[in-house]
């Protein structure tokens, strides 16, 4: 795909149907790479990925993630997200007819699967615009929540919401790169992370730190998007790698089994899966609300 074609797409000069067609062509290229070779080749490729991951920093190019995602203003996201500003996948349950309902269903499911109870001390890693943190504070009024983000604008937005809702004594927001984040050990009943680990690289080391932060009976809840079979990095290898260059620099697509290969410090006790169509429906809903004036674009 030529730079000229991508430039026209960035300027919004193609109808949505053409943009979707282009995305499908790029996806076909990626799938062809993943499916190359026999089952042994695929297994060895995954083992190499795990080995390289375990020797990397916890996160790479964290400043790029901020530039591309997290220092974009809340005003912009207010036009393209639902009322909770949930930056991660929504859950289109049978009763969810609107994005607001699907966001709420996703937040409810997360708390249910994380086995939250009122009165717990909770740490959220990668809190985004505070959708889960504020939801937990509302539904578990006896709990204390520490929310971590690498974005100053996200912290400012969440703290404004905290003041508006009178939650100053229950929510603490920390701005820190995950490479440097540390906190007193043994204090959290629950650690939650929703769609942050795709921006991380060394999962085993971060799992080890999370284990230190948990109480002896504490649990960690991890939500990531995955490919069913293969892990891969988003690397800028040429003009067609728009996603890697402009939106997800330093990110990864984990495989469905990747976390199970990182159990030296934490053991998996339960797993759930949301079908990828929940993400597809969310993206379609965002698209329908994303035709906003250029003056609002970041």
Outline where the language-model segments fall:
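Conserved SAM-binding strand-loop segment of SAM-dependent methyltransferases
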Residues: 165-180
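A short acidic, Gly/Pro-enriched loop at the edge of an enzyme's catalytic core
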Residues: 179-191
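Substrate-binding/catalytic lobe of Class I Rossmann-like enzymes that use SAM or dcSAM, i.e.
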Residues: 226-228, 232-284
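Conserved class I S-adenosyl-L-methionine
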Residues: 118-128
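Conserved SAM-binding loop of SAM-dependent methyltransferases across substrates and taxa
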Residues: 129-141
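Conserved small/polar residues in nucleotide/adenosyl-binding loops
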Residues: 283-291, 298
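A short glycine-rich, Lys/Arg-flanked "PGG" loop and its adjoining helix->strand segment in the class I
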Residues: 204-219
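Conserved Class I S-adenosyl-L-methionine-dependent methyltransferase catalytic core
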Residues: 30-113
């Amino acid at each position: 795909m030529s730079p000229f074609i991508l430039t026209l797409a960035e300027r919004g000069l193609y109808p949505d149907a053409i943009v979707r067609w282009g995305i499908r062509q790029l996806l076909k290229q990626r799938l062809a790479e993943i499916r190359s070779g026999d089952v042994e080749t695929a297994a060895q490729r995954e083992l190499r990925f795990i080995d390289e991951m375990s020797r990397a920093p916890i996160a790479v190019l964290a400043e790029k993630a901020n530039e591309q995602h997290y220092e974009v203003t809340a005003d912009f996201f207010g036009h393209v997200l639902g009322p909770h500003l949930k930056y991660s996948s929504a859950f289109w349950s049978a009763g969810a007819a609107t994005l607001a309902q699907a966001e709420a269903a996703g937040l409810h499911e997360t708390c249910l699967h994380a086995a939250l109870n009122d009165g717990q001390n909770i740490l959220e890693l990668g809190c985004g615009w505070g959708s889960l943190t504020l939801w937990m504070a509302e539904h578990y009024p006896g709990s204390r929540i520490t929310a971590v983000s690498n974005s100053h604008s996200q912290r400012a937005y969440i703290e404004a919401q905290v003041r508006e809702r009178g939650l100053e004594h229950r929510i603490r927001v920390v701005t820190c790169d995950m490479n440097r984040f540390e906190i007193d050990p043994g204090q959290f009943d629950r650690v939650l992370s929703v769609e942050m680990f795709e921006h991380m690289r060394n999962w085993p080391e971060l799992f080890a730190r999370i284990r230190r932060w948990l109480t002896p009976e504490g649990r960690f809840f991890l939500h990531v998007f995955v490919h069913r079979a293969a892990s891969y990095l988003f690397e800028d290898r040429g003009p067609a790698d728009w996603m890697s260059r402009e939106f997800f620099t330093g990110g990864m697509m984990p495989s469905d089994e990747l976390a199970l290969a990182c159990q030296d410090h934490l053991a998996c006790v339960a797993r759930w899966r949301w079908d990828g169509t929940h993400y597809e429906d969310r993206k379609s809903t965002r698209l329908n609300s994303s035709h906003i004036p250029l003056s609002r674009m970041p």
